[in-house]
């Protein structure tokens, strides 16, 4: 598994744009290729979940969506994905009320280029519940991995991003925009 200080590997996934529930809306495609070169000069919060249409995953996705503006205020793009395809993600958005018109990017890593490049494939064949905070130079600055049965805390990811961006010493339990040492 790649860790802090490692460079984000080359990858190509199908991105599902924020706010779309259908493959095309008003003549605009919901899909766009996302690579390591996408979103230049932005921080990236890349999180993985095991499968679409499951039970824990939508709670995390919805919470990242609720916090999307706060991430964007910190020049960060949130991207959440699994190995399920892009059409599955759109169907899930239409099916689950908390994911309707989801305001953040999702991605389909059907080839495993990013899952395997980061080294986060579980023995079951799905992605581990991993989160990577990547700086604008595509260097990994934070990694967190949970077992398949435990959801993560997107608010904690926001807190960590905020602390990393201070470039200062940040104490335990420092609140978002809190004091540094």
Identify the meaning behind each predicted range.
Residues 1-181:
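Chalcogenol-based redox active-site neighborhoods
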